Amino acid sequence: MVNTNLVSIKINNIPLQVPEGTRILDACRANGFHVPYLCYLKDINEIGACRVCVVEVKGIHHLVTSCNNQVQEGMEILTNSPRVREARKINVELLLSQHHTNCPTCVRSSNCELKQVASDLNLTVDRYKNEYPEMIWTSTFPLIRDAGKCIKCMRCVQICDKIQTLNIWDVSGTGSHTTVDVSHNLEIKESDCSLCGQCVTHCPTAALQERDDVEAINGIHGELANDDKVTVAVVAPAVRAAWGEEFGLSPEFATDRRFVSTLKSVGFDYVFDVDFAADLTIMEESNELLARLQQPDKYSWPMFTSCCPGWVSFAKSQYPELLPQLSTAKSPQQMFGAVIKTYFAQKKGIAPENITCVSIMPCMSKKRELILPGMDSAGTGQDIDYVLTTREICRLIKADHIDVSRLSECDFDDPLGEATGAGVIFGASGGVLEAALRTAYHTVTGENPEIGEQSPLKVLRQIGSFKELEIDIKGVKLHCAALSSLGEARRLIQAMKRGECRYDFVEVMACPGGCINGGGQPIRPSFQNKPKDCADRDQCLRGYDARSAIRFSHENKAVQTLYDEYLEAPLSDRAHHLLHVEEY
């Protein structure tokens, strides 16, 4: 409920009225008074650890942290007094004295919050000796932590605890030796980390980042430089909603087809749309759901989606008893890799071992998914050879000095380049469930369902990122749910275990808002880094769907050809071998 009670305050001698209970920081920013901060995340991390947000309050001797103190009637606040400016400078200088300031070679050089705050404070001289801890980490793990860049803001701790409920990070040491490390003194590879990457996208510096695989692709000895290799790039749906942000381009200009041109300029031989494999996933998953519904007593319910490796990892570590309820369908990434190393290789007369398949994803967990057992369909090595996040591919493009603004648009390659609107919405929370039910409805009734207000898929209620839905297919009502974030997943599972709710089909995405807010996406400023603030990415994908000539996976001609020429039918023996997992 919105608080309508107002209090009268002054900020920099200007009288204002703001809602009672408002934090000083929010009151200042809402009224145009800039207050810097480094640790604050609204409703998540409000601990005043960095002390960069301090302000002066009349009648209080000490400076006050504005992120965790509320306005009060008659309060007079100074945001930029000499005393405040000096305190902020000293606090940031002390942070820099323990920070590895290799800014020119840092992956966050262009969007480091610490660097920006230091610049805004006009810090031009290092007044304190620089000493930072040595980086001791497993360099092969997809998530890298550099202790020399950690400013102890505790954002990662709070995001993992409050949003993802995995508690991977914790505070260790005392006094000046206080730091953040993996909980229970574990190595990161021994922890239950799902590799969702939310700690990375909320870190103000490069203390947390993905393992960089750009050099393996674009280095002097990289895959693109090897004339004996056929290089294939496959692009996830959510990438098109965000890649332009790294170049300051609007979504209207930074289209999927312009991204194809960009990847061709980089040197990839083929560029395919993972939306194709999303359509393929829908064909398998929707038919699997219908097959289970025909023998309801044989299975435990609900059936969960399985395309998000962060969610699958979470289920493995937290609720292994639920694994039989996960769809056996591989993710679109792994389905595509299997098809490329078999069907595509045979069709083009290329030995599978001579194909390098690079998946471009909004996700860090995909870097681990590609090495899981059963992901070697041709018997010649991994189906997907490398995963680059959206951030990594953009760094690669910049390193090649490609002027994206001058490139024209280009279609995805055949024969695996056709996709539907149903495949595009995989990148948004609820999209997988909706796409699957569009095709399930057609399989049962022989007719396509309406899309939009007249759709048989009805939203019964929505709370935050949780949606409860229902669809009537020939008199059979399926009760469904779609949710994002692992904390939401835990709450739903616990509610089901208590008998408070029952569902037939549930979609889970590890990242809040879905893949559009994945751990590998471009990093936005912390005050624009909540799911509601990234609604434009969701709308971008929904727009692609609305404009698509074909909006049903079962109408994808390229998918139909794949079944006719190679897979035979959904859930066939060959389809099961290539497109499904035997066990989790």
Region locations from a protein language model:
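Generic start-of-chain signal for non-secretory N-termini
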Residues: 1-23
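Iron-sulfur-associated redox domains of electron-transfer enzymes in respiratory
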Residues: 8, 20-74, 80, 84, ...
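Short strand-loop junctions, especially beta-strand C-caps/beta-turns
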Residues: 12-14, 183-185, 238
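Residues that cap or flank secondary-structure elements
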Residues: 16, 138, 148, 191, ...
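Residue-level recognition of alpha-helix initiation/capping sites
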Residues: 19, 141, 151, 194, ...
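Fe-S ferredoxin-like electron-transfer domains
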Residues: 51-195, 201, 208-225, 230
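Mobile "lid/hinge" segments at catalytic clefts and subdomain interfaces of large enzymes
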Residues: 167, 200, 393-397
